[in-house]
UniProtKB/Swiss-Prot annotation:
Subcellular location(s) per record: Cytoplasm
HAMAP family recorded: Glu_tRNA_synth_type1
Name this protein carries in UniProt: Glutamate--tRNA ligase 1
Reactions the enzyme catalyzes: tRNA(Glu) + L-glutamate + ATP = L-glutamyl-tRNA(Glu) + AMP + diphosphate
Originating gene: gltX1
């Protein structure tokens, strides 16, 4: 069996790190098994779905290193769903209901007042053809419910009907179909709710494993029943824990600051996002891995906790920083070149500055300082005189890492300055900043000519 998984976002907004967690769980699961990854856009909600959101999702996934083997759109597959609807109707497994939302809410309250579970009582099954015609004459259109197999012969006499599956993340799971309402599969306007297209696509695309958030655990039972009603074997299921904000709120597409697009624009490294999204809330140590191969080697779905995990942006920033500061020049070179950081000193420059930056884009700022010089710096008269005296003591080239030590020793002997009084004015003159990379590393990159040009 070839493992085939899918990630099924709705293109109604930007995906966030919680969505990325699901995508990455699926991608890594397929990667380890030598399987396939399907990107399926759940865009049956034609009013809210936007192609620009779908395009952005593809960009976000590519940035994370996820390249689908197949991309499909539910909006192009309505014919398959209609065929499934007719099959279920013919089998007596899909029945029309005419209640309004207000009527259903009233029934729910009545059941609760009688200490009964607030599930649909299948009242629509009792409607005669005349009653249905009367409703339609009023202008009502039916929504269609899937008749769950939680009874022997009388649908009004339900009994405990257990659905079991061995969850690839949570282990053995059981749900009781008698504890849930018959799910609505088709709305009054003929559009489909999530469940039917999802199951039909999983069958048609040969999905072997459905890996998603644990908010879907309960409805897995109804979906397994729907697979069987359509004559198909249900795939394996896996349900990972969800991420929340640091305050415990659930993530949503409205949590814009946590969208993948915003994290990318903020300069966060993609492998920091991937590492944290996958490893947070598991028994694995949260470490920033350099690439997907490393992450896949440490990915263990069953290590996921059963409780939600809090996503802390500060932890993400720390992981991203650790990746930048450990990044070899070969990995950074293409991105540095795109910012104009290239040439014979690009590699020593990167090795000099990487330990002092949080985001790779900051390297461009230091490149400008090295090549063009800092903004003019204001000095006290004493510091200006000191810097000019120090610059008069600059040794001839060639310069290397020892040049800074030997130069500052001479300056110390000549001026009597030491410590901060010596180093701070020189750093400000050379870089315009109070802190930064080791000047022993920067000075050879500046060279004598560019250094003298910074004399105040």
């Amino acid at each position: 069996m070839t493992v085939t998984v899918r990630f099924a976002p709705s293109p109604t907004g930007q995906i966030h790190i919680g969505n990325a967690r699901t995508a990455l769980f699926n991608w890594l699961f397929a990667r380890r098994a030598g399987g396939s990854f399907v990107l399926r856009f759940d865009d049956t909600d034609v009013e809210r779905s936007r192609r620009e959101y779908a395009d952005q999702i593809e960009i976000d996934l590519a940035w994370l290193g996820i390249k689908p083997d197949l991309t499909v759109r539910q909006s192009e597959r309505f014919g398959l769903y209609n065929q499934a609807v007719e099959k279920l109707k013919e089998a007596g497994r899909l029945y029309p209901c005419y209640e309004t939302a207000e009527e259903l809410e009233l029934r729910r309250k009545i059941r609760l007042s009688r200490r009964l579970p607030p599930i649909y009582g299948r009242e629509a099954l009792k409607l005669t053809e005349e009653q249905k015609a009367a409703y339609e004459a009023e202008g009502r259109k039916p929504h269609w419910r899937f008749l769950l197999p939680n009874f022997d012969s009388d649908p009004f006499s339900t009994g405990r009907t257990e659905i079991h599956w061995d969850d690839v993340i949570r282990g053995p799971q059981t749900v009781d179909l008698a504890s849930m309402s018959d799910p609505v599969l088709v709305r009054e306007d003929g559009t489909f709710l999530y469940t039917l297209p999802s199951v039909v696509d999983d069958i048609d695309l040969g999905i072997t494993h459905v890996i998603r958030g644990d908010d879907h655990v309960t409805n897995t039972g109804a979906q397994i029943a729907l697979f069987e009603a359509l004559g198909a074997k249900a795939p394996c299921f896996g349900h990972h824990n969800l991420l929340t904000t640091v305050t415990g709120e659930g993530l949503s597409k409205r949590t814009g600051a946590l969208s993948i697009a915003s994290l990318r624009k903020a300069g966060i490294e993609p492998m920091a996002v991937a590492s944290l999204a996958v490893l947070i809330g598991t028994s694995e140590a949260v470490t920033a891995y350099r690439d997907m191969e490393e992450l896949a080697a440490h990915f263990e779905p069953a290590s996921s906790s059963k409780s939600s995990a809090k996503f802390d942006p500060a932890e993400l920033e720390a992981l991203s920083r650790s990746l930048i500061q450990a990044m070899p020049f070969e990995a950074a070179a293409p991105r540095l070149a795109a910012m104009g950081v290239e040439g014979s000193i690009a590699e020593p420059f990167w090795n000099a500055v990487r330990g002092n930056i949080d985001k790779l884009s900051e390297a461009a700022e230091w490149w400008h300082i090295v090549m063009k010089g800092p903004e003019p710096t204001e000095f006290t008269e004493d510091d200006r005189n000191f810097v000019n005296e120090a610059f008069d003591l600059l040794p001839p080239e060639p310069w290397d890492r020892e040049t800074w030590r030997s130069w500052t020793e001479k300056v110390k002997e000549k001026t009597g300055r030491k410590g901060k009084a010596l180093f701070r004015p020189l750093r400000l003159a050379l870089t315009g900043r109070e802190s930064g990379p080791e000047l022993a590393d920067l000075l050879p990159l500046l060279g004598r000519e560019r250094t003298l040009a910074r004399q105040p």
